[in-house]
């Protein structure tokens, strides 16, 4: 009797690094992490935590660099509307200002150091989120248009938080992080660059408002042309199941049958892909142009200025909308002057800073 011994086959060993790579790139996770997510997640947490702390409890910040600090936190007396994270002081300019560059924590807070910390980590987070969108689309075999559409708001945020301050020479010119601060930034940009008369801003308005109009129109047509699957005694919503393959609405009935009769029949949409393509492209291109407009005005390529009124044959001015806009812009310029505290009036700090004086010798 002979006995045969079979050598067991050795299982392939999987290293910890391979397991980590498999988990990072797996599309079966509840939330896809991805390689971009390794940078996005910590950057987003740092930005969000710092923003919440600064929004609630930050001390006053010398935004203009003239030792007249502005208080903007909730604990400093502001409310939800007026609270904001004040930009880094003009005394810092465009210098990178991490915590270890200041002599103390108080100095770092007084010069608006949290603002740089927030926006730089936030920009890293949103750009890596865009990359994460592309990465997941690639893993699933999808086309990259989702990431392309998201590039528009990413470009807009980059324009107001980084490109514009760099062009103007100081982070103090950036967008304050708050509701009142956003309106302050809008008025300041209008005062300095006449953005309402810039063609790129006009294209941005057309894209955003046009996209909103098309979205409202398409959504109302869809909900008005649902295919009836139930009797008139039951709600139309009970005839559908989430994720079903059959169409739930009649595109031709809504766009060609209804909208075509209201407008011009030949321009009514008869293809679902064309209407959804336009819904994505119009606001995306519009926001791209708006971001490009901020980028050009950052380097003082401003909107059109009509500094002289039209005159009639008698030499009297003919008042137009351009004159009204010029007067409003001049008023905003006065409001945005260094010593005028309109961001906002309730935000002026009561703290007094002692400024050393230099004696002047007279003969």
UniProtKB/Swiss-Prot annotation:
Chain positions listed as propeptide in the UniProt record: 349-363
Post-translational modification: Tyr-164 forms a radical intermediate that is referred to as redox-active TyrZ, YZ or Y-Z.
Chain positions of site Tyrosine radical intermediate: 164
Pfam families from the UniProt entry: Photo_RC (PF00124)
E.C. number: 1.10.3.9
Binding site for a quinone: 218, 268-269
GO BP terms in the entry: photosynthetic electron transport in photosystem II; response to herbicide
Annotated positions binding chlorophyll a PD1: 201
UniProt keyword annotation of NADP present: no
Compartment list: Cellular thylakoid membrane
Bound cofactor: record note: The D1/D2 heterodimer binds P680, chlorophylls that are the primary electron donor of PSII, and subsequent electron acceptors. It shares a non-heme iron and each subunit binds pheophytin, quinone, additional chlorophylls, carotenoids and lipids. D1 provides most of the ligands for the Mn4-Ca-O5 cluster of the oxygen-evolving complex (OEC). There is also a Cl(-1) ion associated with D1 and D2, which is required for oxygen evolution. The PSII complex binds additional chlorophylls, carotenoids and specific lipids.
Predominant location: membrane
GO cellular component, one term: plasma membrane-derived thylakoid membrane
Transmembrane spans: 32-49, 121-136, 145-159, 200-221, 278-292
UniProt: chlorophyll a ChlzD1 binding residues: 121
Binding site for [CaMn4O5] cluster: 173, 192, 336, 348
Annotated residues for binding of pheophytin a: 129
Gene3D superfamilies in the record: Photosystem II protein D1-like
MF terms in GO: chlorophyll binding; electron transporter, transferring electrons within the cyclic electron transport pathway of photosynthesis activity; iron ion binding; oxidoreductase activity, acting on diphenols and related substances as donors, oxygen as acceptor; oxygen evolving activity
Function: Photosystem II (PSII) is a light-driven water:plastoquinone oxidoreductase that uses light energy to abstract electrons from H(2)O, generating O(2) and a proton gradient subsequently used for ATP formation. It consists of a core antenna complex that captures photons, and an electron transfer chain that converts photonic excitation into a charge separation. The D1/D2 (PsbA/PsbD) reaction center heterodimer binds P680, the primary electron donor of PSII as well as several subsequent electron acceptors.
Family indicated by similarity: Belongs to the reaction center PufL/M/PsbA/D family.
Complex and partners: PSII is composed of 1 copy each of membrane proteins PsbA, PsbB, PsbC, PsbD, PsbE, PsbF, PsbH, PsbI, PsbJ, PsbK, PsbL, PsbM, PsbT, PsbX, PsbY, PsbZ, Psb30/Ycf12, peripheral proteins PsbO, CyanoQ (PsbQ), PsbU, PsbV and a large number of cofactors. It forms dimeric complexes.
Protein name stated in the entry: Photosystem II protein D1 1
Native source organism of the sequence: Acaryochloris marina (strain MBIC 11017)
